[in-house]
Regions:
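Gly/Pro-rich turn-and-neighbor structural signature
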Residues: 116, 131, 135-136, 141-185, ...
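Active-site and substrate-binding clefts of carbohydrate-active enzymes
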Residues: 22-52, 59-61, 180-183, 189-193, ...
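A contiguous, surface-exposed recognition patch within enzymatic or periplasmic domains that forms
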Residues: 465, 469-529, 614-685
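Short, well-structured secondary-structure segments
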Residues: 24-114, 120-121, 138-142, 161-167, ...
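Beta-strand-rich recognition/accessory modules
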Residues: 409, 414-416, 531-570, 574-583, ...
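CE4/NodB-like, metal-dependent polysaccharide N-deacetylase domain
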Residues: 117-143, 220-235
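Acidic (Asp/Glu-rich), glycine- and aromatic
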Residues: 441, 446-452, 459-465, 470-474, ...
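Acidic-aromatic substrate-binding/catalytic surfaces of carbohydrate-active enzymes
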Residues: 44-48, 116, 120-123, 433-547, ...
Length: 695
């Protein structure tokens, strides 16, 4: 992204040193975060490669003032397991080097949770900082810089006086890029807060530019004696991102940068709160509901993202940066709930319990706050929603809440959980949390074990992403860097595995379970895996009506051949503590042979290790004459046993998705997909029992 017209005006070069008479206040801040309960080795790697060497280096320069925000759980993890790193933080805090900045303890998107929870999370982190670091925050880090004016009241209610956003927030709202060298003030309902605009130019420069160019970038922000160069960005850029550890520490970038800043008489490092106390605001600002520009791109559906990219290219960098930035933009962060129904489901399940939290015990309330962690709800250049372990964590917290509410007697309810206008049938036994969709064929959309806190229905749909075009139509992209610099992860220069194309398959319906397919042909393995079978029924992704008296989902649908043949489908469920059964009735006026298939999709932590009737799924398998199948999972020490009253053909494969991450493109095993099929003519009755057993 070309940022020449963003704040600080332009990236400097060695021939443009800035005005030597003007000084600038450097407001330098870093934010560190790991998804709540992330893999231990991932957290340890972040600490070893990034957090530990950063604070160890900064300890040598206590006169360098800077701001730090950390999600609360990560800070406590460091305090508990890496006391030396925490000691460096405490030392720098006592020396007046660090200003601690607040936010939600578990790093929620504040505008995506209610005020009660937002204030509870903000206050929880503030109390932690006061108790353990003797620091009371005055400012807030805005998670993923997702701005809605509704957050002002919550921040002010918690005693916070300022928040950092991107300069893009201002530019997209019509502000001049040359006036981003201080703070503005905004309000909501008369509650006022200060807004500091983070310089995109500095965000893309540090630590990727060499030391000299980095200092020159800061000096470019010097317009008058009150000017501030504002940078607040991911600490992970300083050691954890690809190639940065060697660059920042082994090659000495950080040490050289800090020394160069301290030696430069034109630059004064200052805390945000100090600048707020000693300088006037630049005026009043009302900002769009937005995040950083890239987030707006990512939240669009794939065809819209490609159209936005093409439009930017047609406008050209110069016009876009000068005038187009206020007019051309992507979607809002909450679009991720529209783009990914899997994200929306997690979010709305959380919101349902938040709304009814008066009935939650302390442990369940803490699980609710953990469930509000943002990482799993979106996807961009990082894995996010595509990472199964993040979704597993989210469902663990959700099932902790459900477990606290479960009784010996099975409880049922009918409510629109995901707020899509269609009600879901919710079943809570003493052992299982189950939800069935009326919008999608009476299908199973949650299958959670209250004992293991694991959701076997934590599945993902294969969908087209804008970045898949880089795999389908690769282009040679040369990295545009100077000597003594490194690339950002936003560079398009990435090595592509040519076999990734093989897994670029796209589904036309959500990957739930008990999905009803009808075809004129026997289902082949290749057609099932490739989603290329000839579907002639309208039951796989269409609404059913729920009959509360018979506990059954029904649809008056059709089989579509030379004409529509009226076809009726009824699905009646019954429940026990650890099992449930489905009695299927299918009646069609089409009298000739058709093929019925029932699709299951089950998520496992390690799909490659699961045994299906004693053998691994591997590259896929097919079995004939199946009346019973058992999926043994060593991770949960449970087995899913499916019994049928008729012999079926079985096809099974491990479903992979191709997603983008900070290290390139990744093939991720999401779930095991199964299809049990058999022929029928006019009428079919099929009884299926699902049981959870110990291994």
């Amino acid at each position: 992204m070309n940022l020449k017209k963003f704040s600080c005006l332009e990236f400097p070069d060695s021939s443009n040193k800035g005005d030597k008479m003007k000084k600038v206040k450097l407001l330098f801040g870093v934010h560190m975060h790991q998804p709540v309960d992330n893999f231990g080795d991932a957290v340890d790697e972040a600490i070893e490669l990034c957090y530990a060497p950063f604070f160890a280096t900064m300890r040598e320069y206590p006169e360098f003032r800077f701001a730090v925000h950390s999600s609360g759980w990560l800070l406590n993890e460091i305090k508990t397991k890496h006391p030396k790193v925490f000691d460096d933080m405490l030392y720098l805090t006592k020396k007046g080097a660090i200003e601690w900045v607040g936010a939600g303890y578990y790093e929620p998107i504040l505008s995506a949770i209610n005020s009660l929870d937002a204030q509870a999370q903000i206050n929880k982190l503030s109390r932690y900082l006061e108790k353990n670091l003797k620091s009371s925050p005055k400012g807030a880090w805005l998670t993923e810089r997702v701005w809605e004016s509704s957050v002002i009241r919550d921040l002010r209610a918690c005693g916070l006086e300022y928040v950092v956003v991107d300069d893009y927030h201002f530019l997209s709202s019509g502000f001049d890029g040359g006036a981003m060298d201080g703070y503005y003030e905004s309000e909501a309902g008369g509650e006022k807060i200060a807004l500091f605009p983070i310089s995109a130019a500095l965000r893309y420069a540090l630590p990727f530019f060499g030391v000299e160019r980095s200092v020159e970038a800061i000096l470019k922000c010097a317009k008058d004696e009150d000017s501030a160069a504002i940078i607040f960005d991911d600490l992970e850029k300083f050691g954890l991102w690809p190639k940065t550890h060697v660059w920042v520490y082994e090659k000495g970038w950080l040490k050289g940068f800090v020394e160069a800043v301290l030696a430069n008489e034109q630059i004064e490092t200052m805390h945000y709160k100090e600048y707020l106390e000693t300088h006037r605001s630049k005026g009043l600002a009302y900002l769009n509901n937005t995040s950083y520009f890239e987030m707006g791109e990512w939240s669009l559906k794939s065809h819209q993202g490609l159209a936005l990219e093409a439009l930017k290219e047609r406008l050209g960098d110069e016009y876009f940066q000068k005038d187009g930035v206020a007019l051309v933009k992507g979607g809002i962060w909450k679009n991720f709930f529209i783009k990914y129904h899997e994200s929306n489901y997690i979010h709305k399940r959380m919101m349902h319990h938040s709304k009814n939290q008066v009935q939650l015990k302390k442990g369940a309330l803490e699980a609710l706050y953990k469930l509000q962690t943002n990482d799993v709800l979106w996807h961009g250049v990082f894995g996010g929603l595509y990472l199964p372990n993040l979704r597993d964590n989210a469902y663990r917290y959700l099932l902790e809440i459900e477990s606290s509410l479960a009784k010996k007697k099975t409880a049922t309810s009918f409510l629109d959980v995901d707020m899509d206008g269609y009600e879901e049938f919710k079943v809570l036994t003493s052992e299982l949390s189950l939800l069935f969709s009326s919008r999608y064929g009476g299908q199973l959309m949650e299958f959670g074990s209250l004992e293991k806190l694991f959701n076997w229905q934590n599945t993902l749909m294969r969908r087209h992403e804008a970045y898949h075009e880089k795999i389908l139509h690769p282009k040679e992209v040369a990295p545009k860097i100077h000597e003594e610099e490194i690339e950002s992860i936003h560079s398009d220069a990435a090595l592509l595995d040519p076999t990734l194309k093989d897994d670029l398959i796209y589904d036309w319906h959500p990957k739930y379970s008990f999905i009803d397919h009808i075809s004129t042909e026997a289902f082949s393995f290749e057609a099932f895996k490739g989603a290329s079978y000839h579907e002639v029924g309208d039951f796989a992704n269409r609404p059913f009506v729920f009959d509360e008296q018979r506990m059954a989902f029904k649809r008056e649908g059709g089989v579509y051949l030379d004409k529509k043949y009226d076809t009726f489908c009824a699905k009646r469920y019954s429940f026990e503590a650890k099992s449930f059964s489905l009695a299927l009735e299918l009646q069609s006026e089409y009298a000739h042979e058709l093929h019925y298939g029932v699709e299951f999709n089950f998520h496992f932590a390690h799909p490659d290790k699961v045994l299906l009737n004693g053998q691994k799924v591997g590259d896929g398998l097919s079995l004939v004459g199946v009346e019973e199948l058992v999926l043994e999972d060593s991770y949960t020490q449970k087995a899913l046993k499916i019994s049928l009253d008729k012999k079926c053909m079985l096809h099974a494969y491990i479903l992979n998705t191709i997603s983008q991450s900070e290290s390139g493109f990744e093939r991720t095993a999401q779930q095991i997909s199964l299809l049990l099929s058999l022929p029928f003519a006019s009428r079919l009755e099929l009884l299926t029992q699902m049981e959870v057993c110990d291994v």
